[in-house]
UniProtKB/Swiss-Prot annotation:
Activity regulation remarks: Inhibited by alpha-ethyl-N-4-pyridinyl-benzeneacetamide (EPBA) and 4,4'-dihydroxybenzophenone (DHBP).
Organism: Mycobacterium tuberculosis (strain ATCC 25618 / H37Rv)
Cellular compartments annotated: Cytoplasm
Protein name: Sterol 14alpha-demethylase
GO annotation, biological process: sterol biosynthetic process; sterol metabolic process
Gene name as annotated: cyp51
Residues binding heme b, per UniProt: Q72, Y76, K97, R326, H392, C394
Subunit structure: Homodimer.
Amino acid sequence: MSAVALPRVSGGHDEHGHLEEFRTDPIGLMQRVRDECGDVGTFQLAGKQVVLLSGSHANEFFFRAGDDDLDQAKAYPFMTPIFGEGVVFDASPERRKEMLHNAALRGEQMKGHAATIEDQVRRMIADWGEAGEIDLLDFFAELTIYTSSACLIGKKFRDQLDGRFAKLYHELERGTDPLAYVDPYLPIESFRRRDEARNGLVALVADIMNGRIANPPTDKSDRDMLDVLIAVKAETGTPRFSADEITGMFISMMFAGHHTSSGTASWTLIELMRHRDAYAAVIDELDELYGDGRSVSFHALRQIPQLENVLKETLRLHPPLIILMRVAKGEFEVQGHRIHEGDLVAASPAISNRIPEDFPDPHDFVPARYEQPRQEDLLNRWTWIPFGAGRHRCVGAAFAIMQIKAIFSVLLREYEFEMAQPPESYRNDHSKMVVQLAQPACVRYRRRTGV
């Protein structure tokens, strides 16, 4: 049977196709693709055709494909100005795999990371006092800068950071406008601020580097990743890496883990506050669990079922990445439809995670869907995809889950939280490829008593 033409979603008659709709309501656009076209449909993103896959069979093709067939590098033009040339998304598949196999994410390191995360949380809340109010985006974005830098680069580097690094990093993430598919260097405000923020981060890292060079560590045990990179020499005997290159490496190492953990932590707390029965169950679970006197570094690596189910349901409803992109490097057929070389091929956690045939009452918050016998995450391995799936499952998934468990093992045992604005007012800002919580996103806290 010969392949049939790819169906195209309605609309998109402007010069850049569906780009403006993708900038303003990407989830609405992608849901319309599924509703009108089924598991395989297309929309137009500037000069590129995007083949959006959804549903189990189409997603399986997407997640099983290797880099030789579907390549990430050219699918994210907005990343090169952020990372710099030659870093991760601008590198070859082999180099990316080498970079992403970060020793810090290996299992034997996790216990130390859990203790580090607990320490960072306690430092962040040290001046909270008995009661107050925070903005979730501000708080968790700064906290996860400190946790990710401490765990992935080293506590020594983290201790030389302050709130400036977090603010600049946030501005960098705001520079991921889909207009990058037209030109990632367009003279628009968010790209100008992106470039200024990156220059600011390079200046901060260069300042730290200069201090390290002036006072090199005398003891090997006192070295972190920055010291190691500074010490690497080229054949000429000069430093192998510039401050710009090292900053790019650090940005790339922290990038996926930072915004995913920040957003997921925020939404986990929002959903707990929206659903007081789930909140009470998690509090009871944590109080009983930590009643044995053991540390966060012990329990965060073990099962915390109620909290984990809340986390899974939060990830299903609010996936930190709403679309995953690749570029087709050959001709392929998916469910009778032909994909051509050069096409952008996409999968959408935001759409697949809410397919009603796989997830009954898909828009409802139901942590029990992960309990036996339902286990909807395991049953639907190609549509429960907040971390991707198959060979492209996120390398940091275990770290991300452990981090959230460690964060809430501290926060929920120390403080009670309640919403400071209407429940429906908490929402994501989808105007950028890196999804952020929209502000304001305020909550009130009060120290727990009698614990």
